[in-house]
A protein has these predicted regions:
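Short hydrophobic beta-strand element within catalytic cores of glycosyltransferases
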Residues: 39, 306-309, 319
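A short, well-ordered alpha-helix in the C-terminal region of glycosyltransferases
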Residues: 335, 342, 349-365, 371-380
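Conserved acidic donor-binding segment of nucleotide-sugar-dependent glycosyltransferases
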Residues: 321-322, 326-333, 342-348
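Short His-centered aromatic/hydrophobic patch
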Residues: 91-97, 115
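A conserved mid-protein helix/loop that constitutes part of the nucleotide-sugar donor-binding site
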Residues: 20-25, 200-226, 249, 334
C-alpha cells in the first residue's frame, strides 16, 4: 500500500508558521517511507529548502480568497489529481480547502484537513466559510483545545462518516537541542543584538501583533523593575511587524514611557531561533488570545529553558505547570511580573531541573517524528 500512497498537500504559502512547517515535515517524511509527495502552494521562504528530488512542487495562487480563483484552482487540482493519480488531498487552510473539497468530490479521492487555528467568525457567512475544514473524511486538530473548539462550534458539520482526531503538532528536537550550539555563534548573536552578557536575558518571540501580548510584556517588565528597584535583565522582543508600523511605534513609545529604552531590544528577525533561545535565560509567551498550539512554549522546553506562558489555548497542554514551566493569568501584567520575579530568583539547580523536565516532555509528546508517523498512519488507515 505505502508505495502506492501519493499525497498532495495544499497550503497558501510555505512560510515559517506552524501549518507551513508541518506541511514541510510531512512532505519529506513520506518519501522516506516509500510514498510520493506533492505540494501545491503560491510560494514562500521554505520553498528553497524543499528537496525537489523527493517532493514535487506546483505553484498556484491558492492563497487567494477570490471565489473565481478558488474555482479555477479546483479544476487545476482535478488535473493534477488525475495525471499523478493522487491518493488523497490534505488541505491546511480554508481558501484552498474549498478548491480541494470540490476537486476530491469530482475525482472521488479522500480529503483530509488540519484545523490549525480557531478561525474567528463574527457572522454565519464567515462560519460557513470556516466550515470547509470540517467537511473532510479526516479532520485533524492540532491540540485538544482545537478539538473542543471544533466540537463546540462546528458540530452540525460532523457525522459518523467523518473522523475527528487530535494529532499534536511536533517540532524538530534535533534542531531545538541546547547541546548543538557553539559559543562563538552565541557571542556573535549577542553582539548583533547589542547586548553584553552581564545580565540575564528574557526573550519574547512572536510577530508584532496586539494579541501576541507585547504590551502586557512591557508593562510586566516595568512592574518587575519597580519591585526590584533596578534593571536586573535585558528584554528582547523578537519578531517582525509585518507592516504594522503603527503598532511597533506604539510599543516603542510604551517602552520609552516606562524608561525601558536601554533595557528592551526590538529585533526584527533571527534566522536561527534555537540560538536565540540558547542565549536567553527565560522565555515568555504572552498571547492574550488562545493559540491552537503555541510553538514558542514547545521550542523553549526543547531547549531546556524555563517558559512562562499565558494560561489559555495550547500552552495548557504543552506546559506541565510548575514542572516544565509556569502559567500566568492571560492579559494580566501583574501576574506575569510575579512569575518573572519568581523565575529570576530561582537557583541554578532548580532551573536545570525545569529545563531537563521540559526537554523530556517535548521529546516524548511533541516530537516531529511522532507527528509525522501518526499522520502517515492515519493516511493509510483512511485509504484502507
Amino acid at each position: 500500500m505505502s508505495s502506492d500512497l501519493k499525497v498532495l498537500q495544499v497550503i497558501p504559502k510555505l512560510g515559517y508558521g506552524g501549518a507551513e512547517t508541518g506541511c514541510f515535515d510531512i512532505a519529506h517524511y513520506l518519501p522516506e517511507n516509500n510514498c510520493k509527495s506533492f505540494i501545491v502552494t503560491s510560494g514562500g521562504e521554505l520553498l528553497k529548502f524543499v528537496d525537489r528530488k523527493k517532493v514535487k512542487i506546483f505553484r498556484l495562487p491558492v492563497q487567494s480568497k477570490n471565489p473565481l480563483l478558488i474555482l479555477i484552482n479546483a479544476f487545476i487540482l482535478i488535473g493534477i489529481i488525475l495525471v499523478y493519480n493522487i491518493s488523497l488531498v490534505h488541505a491546511r487552510s480554508r481558501a484552498p480547502a474549498w478548491s480541494c473539497l470540490l476537486a476530491t468530490k469530482i475525482t472521488g479521492r479522500k480529503f483530509v484537513t488540519t484545523f490549525h487555528g480557531t478561525y474567528n467568525f463574527k457572522s454565519n457567512i464567515k462560519k460557513i466559510y470556516n466550515s470547509v475544514m470540517t467537511r473532510a473524511d479526516l479532520i485533524i486538530a492540532g491540540s485538544n483545545f482545537i478539538f473542543s473548539h471544533i466540537k463546540k462550534n462546528y458540530s452540525k458539520y460532523l457525522n459518523e462518516k467523518k473522523k475527528l482526531m487530535v494529532i499534536f503538532r511536533g517540532i524538530n528536537v534535533d534542531y531545538f537541542d541546547p547541546t548543538t550550539k557553539i559559543e562563538i555563534d552565541e557571542k556573535k548573536l549577542l553582539k548583533k543584538w547589542d547586548i553584553e552578557k552581564d545580565k540575564k536575558i528574557i526573550l519574547l518571540p512572536g510577530r508584532l501583533t496586539s494579541w501576541k501580548g507585547q504590551e502586557v510584556f512591557i508593562e510586566a517588565i516595568n512592574l518587575v523593575n519597580i519591585e526590584l528597584g533596578y534593571e536586573a535583565f535585558y528584554a528582547v522582543i523578537l519578531g517582525s511587524d509585518q507592516g504594522r508600523d503603527l503598532y511597533k511605534k506604539k510599543l516603542i513609545r510604551l517602552s520609552e514611557q516606562y524608561r525601558l529604552s536601554k533595557q528592551i531590544r526590538f529585533i526584527d528577525h533571527c534566522k536561527d531561533m534555537a540560538l536565540a533561545y540558547k542565549v536567553s535565560d527565560i522565555i515568555v509567551s504572552a498571547s492574550t488570545e488562545p493559540e491552537a498550539f503555541g510553538r514558542v512554549a514547545v521550542e523553549a522546553q526543547s531547549m531546556e529553558k524555563p517558559i512562562i506562558a499565558s494560561n489559555i489555548g495550547g500552552s495548557n497542554e504543552t506546559i506541565i505547570d510548575e514542572k516544565t514551566g509556569f502559567l500566568y493569568e492571560a492579559g494580566n501584567a501583574k501576574s506575569l511580573s510575579n512569575k518573572i520575579l519568581r523565575t529570576l530568583n530561582m537557583d541554578e539547580t532548580l532551573l536545570k531541573s525545569i529545563g531537563n523536565e521540559g526537554r523530556k516532555n517535548i521529546v516524548q509528546k511533541f516530537n516531529v517524528e511522532k507527528m509525522c508517523f501518526s499522520t502517515y498512519s492515519e493516511y493509510k488507515r483512511l485509504l484502507n
